Amino acid sequence: MKTTLIFCILGIVIPTAVVSSQDFCGLSQQEREDYWECVERGMSADELNQAKLFLECINKQSAVELLAFFCNADSIEDSIEKEEFRLLFAECLKSHPASFNAGNESCLKEARK
C-alpha cells in the first residue's frame, strides 16, 4: 500500500516538475507574457532579441505557436524584421527539431532554408 502511494505521488510530482521546467525556462511571469504578446502581434528586432532566451528553451506548445506565426509571417510588413525572425526561427528549429514534429511539413521545409 505504501509503495503504491509513493509511486502515485512520484507519478504526479515528476511529470509536473518536468513540464514546469520547460514552461518557465528561467523566465519571470512578466517575461513570458511579454514573449507571447510579441508572438501574437509580430516581433520587432529588439523583441526578437528579448525572446531569444525563451527560444533556447522551447517546448512543444511554444513550437506550435512559433510555427503558426512563421507560417503567417507574410503579415509582417518590414522585410528586414521578417528575415530576422526567419533566421531566429530556423536556428530554433535546428536546435530543437523534435519540438516541431506536429507542425505543417511544407512550412517546416520553408523554415529550414
Swiss-Prot record:
Primary location group: secreted
Signal sequence extent: 1-21
PTM summary: Contains 3 disulfide bonds.
Keyword Cell membrane tagged: no
Alphabetical UniProt keywords: Disulfide bond, Secreted, Signal
GO cellular component assignments: extracellular region
Tissue-wise expression: Expressed by the venom gland.
Places the protein is found: Secreted
Keyword Signal carried by entry: yes
Protein name: Venom protein 184
Naturally occurring in which organism (per UniProt): Lychas mucronatus (Chinese swimming scorpion)
